[in-house]
Every structure is written in structure tokens, then in C-alpha cells.
């Protein structure tokens, strides 16, 4: 019996030791678990502070970036303002250079009418010269006709014929005068006005030529009657 009891006691002891070891291990694990949270708490606090510092630095960097961007924009605006006045004087200079170029055109236009008027004046002069030439040509023809008729007619009749001839020659010589007066008016008038007197002068010459012809025919009729 005693042996059994001893075994039981020993078994109890063994169990007790095992239980004690288990308890110790459990307590150690508990202490370790308790210690790790305590150690992790400072680390978490340190991490939180680092995060806060990083977040604070980021806004600072962002603010610095915004300030730099604003400065760049201000510089760009100032540069644009400086370039704009420079461009405006250049444009004004270009416009001033372009404006004087058309100026010679009116001068040329003003000079053009001068030669045109000069050309018109010679035209008018030529027309008047033609009219006077026609009148002069008609006058010699009248003179020749009178010379041929004078020998055939008697002396008094020749005198009477010469008197109308003189009267006929006077209008012919007096008529070219208005044409000479018309020349300055034609030089001052435009081309259309200058062209108008030109046909008028030959028209005036035609009546002059017709008048001597009529005078010559009347003289011939008088000579035939005689």
C-alpha cells in the first residue's frame, strides 16, 4: 500500500511540476505579450509623429510650389507686357513705312494730268493750226480765182469784184482768231472738252471753204453775164 501511495505521491509531484512548468510558460507568454504592446506603442507613436512631420512638409512643399508657380506666372505676365509695347512700336513703324509708299502714287497721278493737259493743248493747237491752214489755203485759192477773173472782166468790174473779195477775205482772217483764243481754254479743260473743239474747228473750216466757193461761183456768174 505504501508503495502505491508513494507512486501516487510521486505522480502528484510530477503532475505538480508539469503544471508548474505549464503555469510558468503561460505566465512567460503572458508577460511577453504584455511587453510587446508596450514596446509597439512607442513605435506607433514615433510612426505617427513621422507621418505628421511628412504631412506638414508636404503642405510646405505644395505652398512653395504654388508660390513658385505664381512667381513664374507673374514673370511671364511682365514679359508679355514688355513684349507687347515693343510689338506696338514695331507695328506703328511698319504702318508708317507702309503709309509713305502710297504717297508717291497721288503725286504721279497729279503729274499725269499735267502731261495729259499738255498733250491736249498741242492737240487743240494743231486743230486751230489746221483750221487756220484751211482758211489760208482757201484765201490763196480765192486770190488765184480772182486773178484769173480780173483779166477777163473790165476795170470797174474788177474793182467791184475785188471789194467783195476783200470783204470775204477779212472774215476768213478774222475767224481763226476765236480758234486761237480757244487754245488756252482747251488746255485748261479736260480731255473730253479738248476733244470737242477739235472736231468743231474742221467744222468751222468747212463753212469757210464753202464761202469762198460760193464767192467764186458768184464771180464766175458775173463774168459770164458780162
UniProtKB/Swiss-Prot annotation:
Q: Which GO terms describe its molecular function?
A: calmodulin binding; protein domain specific binding; transcription cis-regulatory region binding; transcription corepressor activity
**From start to end residue, where is composition biased (Basic residues)?**
1-11
Q: Where is the composition biased (Basic and acidic residues)?
A: 15-27, 49-94
Crosslink Glycyl lysine isopeptide (Lys-Gly) (interchain with G-Cter in SUMO2): position given as 25, 86, 159
Cite the entry's keywords alphabetically.
Answer: Cell membrane, Cell projection, Isopeptide bond, Lipoprotein, Membrane, Myristate, Phosphoprotein, Ubl conjugation
Which InterPro entries does this one have?
BASP1
The listed locations are: Cell membrane; Cell projection, Growth cone
Q: GO annotations under biological process? A: negative regulation of DNA-templated transcription; podocyte differentiation; protein homooligomerization; supramolecular fiber organization
- Biased amino acid composition, Low complexity: 106-140, 150-226
As stated in the Swiss-Prot or TrEMBL entry, residues carrying the post-translational modification Phosphoserine are 40, 92, 128, 131, 160, 167, 169, 173, 192, 218
Write out the GO cellular component annotations. Answer: cell junction; chromatin; COP9 signalosome; cytoplasm; growth cone; nuclear matrix; nuclear speck; nucleus
Disordered as annotated region, ranges? 1-226
At the top level, the lineage of the source is Eukaryota
Phosphothreonine sites (modified residues): 31, 36
Q: Where is the lipid attached (N-myristoyl glycine)?
A: 2
Similarity remark: Belongs to the BASP1 family.
Report the protein name in the record: Brain acid soluble protein 1
Provide the taxonomic classification. Answer: Eukaryota, Metazoa, Chordata, Craniata, Vertebrata
Amino acid at each position: 500500500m505504501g508503495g502505491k501511495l508513494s507512486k501516487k505521491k510521486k505522480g502528484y509531484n510530477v503532475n505538480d511540476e508539469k503544471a508548474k512548468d505549464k503555469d510558468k510558460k503561460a505566465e512567460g507568454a503572458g508577460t511577453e505579450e504584455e511587453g510587446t504592446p508596450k514596446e509597439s506603442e512607442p513605435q506607433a507613436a514615433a510612426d505617427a509623429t513621422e507621418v505628421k512631420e511628412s504631412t506638414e512638409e508636404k503642405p510646405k512643399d505644395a505652398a512653395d510650389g504654388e508660390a513658385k508657380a505664381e512667381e513664374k506666372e507673374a514673370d511671364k505676365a511682365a514679359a508679355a507686357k514688355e513684349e507687347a509695347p515693343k510689338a506696338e512700336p514695331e507695328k506703328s513703324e511698319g504702318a508708317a513705312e507702309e503709309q509713305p509708299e502710297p504717297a508717291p502714287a497721288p503725286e504721279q497721278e497729279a503729274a499725269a494730268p499735267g502731261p495729259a493737259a499738255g498733250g491736249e493743248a498741242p492737240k487743240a493747237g494743231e486743230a486751230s493750226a489746221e483750221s487756220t491752214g484751211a482758211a489760208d489755203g482757201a484765201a490763196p485759192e480765192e486770190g488765184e480765182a480772182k486773178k484769173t477773173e480780173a483779166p477777163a472782166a473790165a476795170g470797174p468790174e474788177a474793182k467791184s469784184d475785188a471789194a467783195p473779195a476783200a470783204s470775204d477775205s477779212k472774215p476768213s482772217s478774222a475767224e481763226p482768231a476765236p480758234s486761237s483764243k480757244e487754245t488756252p481754254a482747251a488746255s485748261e479743260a479736260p480731255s473730253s472738252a479738248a476733244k470737242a473743239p477739235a472736231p468743231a474747228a474742221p467744222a468751222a473750216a468747212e463753212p469757210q471753204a464753202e464761202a469762198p466757193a460760193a464767192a467764186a461761183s458768184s464771180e464766175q456768174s458775173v463774168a459770164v453775164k458780162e
